[in-house]
């Protein structure tokens, strides 16, 4: 998570989204289902040009002390709450209780992932939930007029200074972008065995 925060200072970087994911049981209103849980940063919606249908997305909390808020994918909202407005309701993810603050617009399937059958929680809480030491990947968007090689070099410089060695991979997501269509100028990076970095 500290790596992601450091990348915010790289020139031309627009949004930074630290990411971890796994599967967990989600319970509410006496109903339960197993869904994909995405641990993300507060800029995830901007990074992937996704819109909130109801309520709001995760707030910019201190990453080390993020509140137990959750944003529901549209299918999870429908399955657990039907036509009832879920905002303010409590749901259980794993052994923790979260307060629903938003519902995402329907996105359907992207690259084989059903983005509607998911929930979004703060990345630090996802790391605890899945007992992980580090991020899976960090998504970075950069300004469209910035040269890609300069952005990559800036990210590499910051990570080398923090890690002392090149234990990460940086992957410009051009093929993914062609498929997704709606995401522009994003980079993803993967950090060592614990995770990765993507440039979107």
What are these regions, as identified by a protein language model?
Residues 21-23, 61-63, 138-139, 173-176:
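Short linear capping/connector segments at secondary-structure termini
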Residues 2-57, 170-171:
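Short amphipathic beta-strand/extended segments in non-transmembrane regions
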Residues 25-28, 108-112, 177-180:
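A short acidic, helix-capping loop that chelates divalent metal ions and anchors anionic groups
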Residues 38, 42-62, 66-165:
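Mid-to-C-terminal secondary-structure elements
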Residues 154-155, 164-197:
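Peri-transmembrane interface segments
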Residues 8-9, 46, 128, 161, ...:
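Solvent-exposed polar/charged
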